[in-house]
Amino acid sequence: MGMKRLIFLVFLLISFSLFGGYAYFSRYPVLHPDEGLSFVISDLENITLNVWKISEEDFLKAVFDPESFNFSLLEITRPIYSKKFSSEEWKEFSFPLKDRGFYFATLVSNEGTVFRRVIDRSLFIVTDLEAIYFSDSEKLRLHVFDSDGDFVEGAEVLLFEDSKLIDRVFTGKDGVVSITKHFDTFYIRYGDSRFFGGVYFSGGGLEREKLFFVTDRPIYKPSDTVHFRGQIFSFEEGLYKAFEKTKVTVSIFDTKKNEVYRSEFETDELGGFSGSMKLPDTASVGLYKVNVDHGGRRYYEYFLVEEYRKPEYKVEIETDKDVYISGEVVNYLVRVKYFNGQPVAKAQVAYYVRAFPEEGSGYLVYRGTDFTDEEGNLRLGVKTEEGFQGSYRLEVIVTDESQRQIEETRSVKVYADNVLISPLDRYVSTSPGKQVRVKVKVTDLSGNPLNGLLTTSSEDSTSTVAVENGEAIVTFTPKEPKSYRIELSFGKANTHFYVYAYCGAGTSSEFVINPATNTVKPGDELSVQILAPGKVMGVLGIVSNRVYDTIPVSFTGSVNLRVRIPKDIPEKNLFISFVGLDDNGRIYKLERLNVLLDTNFTTMKILFDKDQYEPGEMAQITIESNVDRVCLFLVDEAIYAMVGAEPPVLENFLYPYMNYPRTRGGFPHYWRLYVSRNSFRNKLASLPEEKTFADFKQNALPSKLNVREYFPDTALWIPSLKLHNGTARVSFKVPDSITSFRATAYGFSKDRFSQTESEMVVSKKFYLMPHLPSFLRESDVIKISATVFNRTSKTLPVQLTVELPENIELLEGSSSRHFLMEANSSHTETWTVKAVSASEGSFVKFVAVGEDLNDAVSMRLPVERFAFEREFYRIMLLDGKETLEIPGQFISSRIRFLDSIVPLVEDSLKRLIDFPYGCVEQTMSRFFPAVVAASAGIEVENLEEIIQRGLFKLYSYQHNDGGWGWFRFGESDDFMTCYVMEGLYFTMKAGYDVAESVLQRGIEYLRKHPSAYGSYVLDLYGVNHEPFKPESEADLVFLSLSSKEALKQLMNYVVQDEQKAYLNVYSNNPLISEIQLNSVFLRALAKWKEFPELERKVTNYLLLKKDSAFWTSTKDTSFVILALLEAMPEYASTTLKVINSENTFELKPGEERSLVPGSLTVSGKGIVEVEVVYIEVPKEAVSEGLEIKREFYKRYELLIEENKMIVDAFVPIGRGYVPRSIHPVEKEQTEELYILPYKYWKKTIEYRGVPLEINGAEVKIKGETYTFFRIETFNGLILVFFRNEALIYDTEKNTITRYLDVTDAGFMRSGPVFLMKGFVLVGDEKIPVPEDVTGLSCTMDEILLRGENKTYWYRNGEFVDLPFVARRVFFWDGKKLVAENIRFSGSSKTLRNRVFEVVFDVGDVKIELGDIIKTVVRVKGDGNYLIVEDFIPSCAQVLSNYREKGIEENKFSYSWYSSWNAWYSGREIRTDRVALFARYLYGNSFDYVWRATAEGVFHLLPARVYPMYSRGLYAHTDPDVLFIGADFIDGRDDQP
């Protein structure tokens, strides 16, 4: 029996417990004469087995169409057998069917009553025939034999596809028939015998044509260009050869299966083609699929798109050997090297050694921190535990001078002894009472056979078996239907195998296939011996990617066969696959052979004209080979190290190694009836299906993805280079990267191919490497540094100079440093600088000079303002004179005089395009008006790129239901879907390709979710739909775009004066604003041209609503621009007279001029725009309808030695408590009770003579029942706490006292304690409490109040903050905490269901270089569609994939896929900030983790929150200053 069936049956038996007792037919429905019809009964009484003999016609009708077949017609006849069975435990019964023919059987409960229920049904064939088949994608070979082992010649085989007869064939000699027509079911007739079964055709077969497809590298970032090359091959005369000139179509699909690229190519004369696709910066990350269509065939390839950061150095871990014996020392060597081969000296290495036993969970063995030596090496020795068997894994986190981290792991195998115990079968199936025999090999680790005694044990029995010449036979007889674990030990070594005693036996471990050799050549004749303990009949398949031959076999004991190895095999492995039967049941056996192929691959060389290059040099590559064309590319070695992928090997692609055959070989599969509504099988069928995740997305590429992105990942890409006389030369400029590039070349001719690799090292004997942040903020003080590398063989006097721009000043010391550098060494210098003023274009230059050697690097280091930009904006439709006041301290200003709205549209479009965020609405609002503007003749810069970026993001954000929401996650929104679909329509109308799959899904969504806006959009697409009946005035607005009647109805809601007009209409949807509705109204007016004067006034209204570069939001701006473009109004104008403070000047239409602070008076006629940008330096928190707070927490790693694991403790920055140690403790056992709801069901617990009858969340005391939250006792008092009340029962006085308006209650040594609104009551004393207190955590002696993220300790008349919360605190003395369910203040994970002792020190929680910090932002208030922005310090490396460690996690516990479960809709990490987008505030905080990569004083702008689509709500925190490093302590009691 195959493992899949075995696992399925085990699953059945486990699942049966869901439904109580059960009964079902077991084993196969094809039976041989006198073989028992088998069924199982467990925990059921009076189950009746009924058996009917039926006709061939009824059998075929029933098995082909069981859902339609009327089984009651069979059941009304008298059965040939009927008997009742019962069993209290699992028991298998058998009823013999002697005569050949067809049978129907049922298992029925309550037979003969009105409660009769059919539990299971089945159809059976009793036959003396058996069948075995082998198949690939092109053919199937079917062997038919009888129960005596004779193969049946002349049997009629009827072939069916989807229950329809498609052909009839007959078996030939040896009972075999070869069939090329595809079918799924067959029916055999031979004399009076019949057989029925199903088959599968496999995916294997001869690949007569292959496509080799390669991209220049395996991974890309959004905005990169993907280069690809394809080569088609055809199989001729046993070899693959290049194809001829032909045509192919290449299609590329994004992660949502939307087509984003399609192109047709004409190949060269060898069947080669190449192309490229530019990814926009909005391209979704994940796995992209490539389809290549050629000649009716379709090929699939993939590439990965990720927001990665390329590492600058690599970490390698070596061991002195791969296999160890317990007790030995594992000697690890950690090598840290830059990609140019130079060592990373003095790199900090945090290391963790974990042990993973073969059984059980892994645990921490050893940890520490050290530094690499001058050669970039760190040596570490770890002794393995005695008797341990499993693996040891070293995990390292390395940081260099830049403080960017790289991680690496290395595992080794550890054996308990120099002994290897190898059962030939790890999983054995049998039936209760039937003995199994398992052959076991016992050798040393080198494979030498051992002698001695093997100890076996199972449950309570232990025995020994003799091992002779490395072999032993272990026998075991299961007694019950269950699984058994058989332990095997020899010396210190041990292992196990499993016996599943639920069904028939499987392959005996004594069945052996012995080929004369495991290495063959095409055309060889191979001698194969088969050994078996008894009589065997079956088929030997010669298979690999296809079925080459099948050989029928029938023998007793042994047989010798001669097997011909196929001459035209293109695979490097061949398999001997045996399928058959012996006395124990079915046999499956597979042997793998190596095939020595003589392929048509030739040699190739890549020669560089130098061993090493300097950045910017010209390099020449020479390629030598006897092929015609070469595909050549050079990729940064860091890419391959980061991804862990190598360029594909062409020879192995054409002539592959095979681990398993791609063919099918086995017995036919059989039918099962699922026709009883109440049958157990139907209940199982209703259980949820197993789900699998298979999009290969590596959502959390590990933190190896670090360091800089300044230089190209692909240095050279030449898809097709011709060779002349076997040689080609290429010259190119070497990139500025100091690294190594891997050169890969594939060579192609008609019948010869080649591949080779080489390395190009880019380095210098003397060079420097700056360590700078990505930006600074005004007033930041930071230590910047640069490392100089001297790779010469002599000592050098070095001068290292930093040249700073005017806006960055040096605080101490000289800008030039002088030092001596030893040969082959590195040296780092540090400068403390301060950012004085803002500048986007500031550059820092480093120059190093050592005698006649030098290097210089200039890097941009922008300085941002420590301020928020504000805007004063006015539009005036001037016809006369107007005066206003211009604010001071502005950074830019202008007044502009216009006679056309086009400049306004152009400016707003540009601001829309440059808007920094990218939800669905903002993406749509960028390119939708851009498309319409371009169609109206307005020039839009980079329109193609804008559209491509927008389409890619919209494809990625479309939901599975076809709709769009605000972001990728969350629910689909009707308005947003309409908005996107309207924009896609106009994009198509403008001549751009839009993925058909996206449109179809969107249309389907609009059909299922009718709306007024959707009705108009469906009309655009010409889709028939039911007319939408307006439910509000806002519906009329959208319907007016396609209905003149709806427009006329809107006239009832128009408000107007001489200059402007607007619709007094509102929508309940917060996404639809008044400006937006009036913009749609203007579009309808422009379309129907019924009310020209009203059209002019609505245009004026919208222009006057413009209060900045935007109309309130990106969405409103987009809608207004669309309306203005359709209305395109004209305005009369004159010369504009301007008086600004003491300045007087005139402007003509189209002219503009800057302004000065003070009054501004303008007079004339036309459109006047005034725009002033000024700065506002935040000094304190602001709260206008919303509240926001920001907190910082430092991570401490705490080792739980008893559990051998590490947990993260995040505690607040500042003066406080530093956690130092943690370990689990046992609860002290007392008579006192502490009971939470649902701990007990229907249980009575007595306390001091008082019975407490507990049932779930209810307790009965003295005849009264209470629904409780908690029950506690102390010193004879019983506390029952329930909603807003507490009850104290005194067992001595027999009295009950009730307390009302209680938030929480507990006990101290002095008596009960009650938390009430605003105070805590201790005896008669009322103590006011902080606002965020939610509960009590008092000990017997200390008042502890539980806050949201801290505990308040009442001491000496005031509250002290403690950096933890706990459900229950047993002890606290100011340093030692004993509690359960502890969560540290900044941690997101609770140490659940355990009591821990944590020891704290009182001291400063300071941020040091390299520390891990968590920023938590908490938001309160009402609002929707909010943006939360937090401005990060300039020294922060945000660890976007950081996973906090709780007691269930280990250091390297990464998940490559996790579903989105955050309360907010989306998050974006940018250079200077982290932004969060929340549709609603149904969560109140978010956090992110960062690493401090530099020392200094860092100024943080306030975190802020504001709505995206409305005004009036706003909040920001206080600004903060972070002091990082020992040299930057400000002396305050807390920080920030």
From Swiss-Prot:
GO cellular component, as recorded: extracellular space
Keyword vocabulary terms for this entry: Protease inhibitor, Signal, Thioester bond
A Pfam match: MG2
CDD domains for this protein: A2M_like
InterPro entries in alphabetical order: A2M/Complement_sys, A2M_N_BRD, Alpha-macroglob_thiol-ester_cl, Alpha-macroglobulin_TED, Bact_MG10, Ig-like_fold, Macroglobln_a2, MG2
A single GO molecular function term of this UniProt record: endopeptidase inhibitor activity
Signal peptide, first to last residue: 1-23
SMART domains reported for this sequence: A2M (SM01360), A2M_N_2 (SM01359), Thiol-ester_cl (SM01419)
Source taxon at top rank: Bacteria
Cross-link Isoglutamyl cysteine thioester (Cys-Gln), where in sequence: C919-Q922
Family from the record: Belongs to the protease inhibitor I39 (alpha-2-macroglobulin) family. Bacterial alpha-2-macroglobulin subfamily.
Function text: Protects the bacterial cell from peptidases.
PANTHER family: CD109 ANTIGEN (PTHR11412:SF136), MACROGLOBULIN / COMPLEMENT (PTHR11412)
Name of the protein in question: Alpha-2-macroglobulin
Species this protein is from: Thermotoga maritima (strain ATCC 43589 / DSM 3109 / JCM 10099 / NBRC 100826 / MSB8)
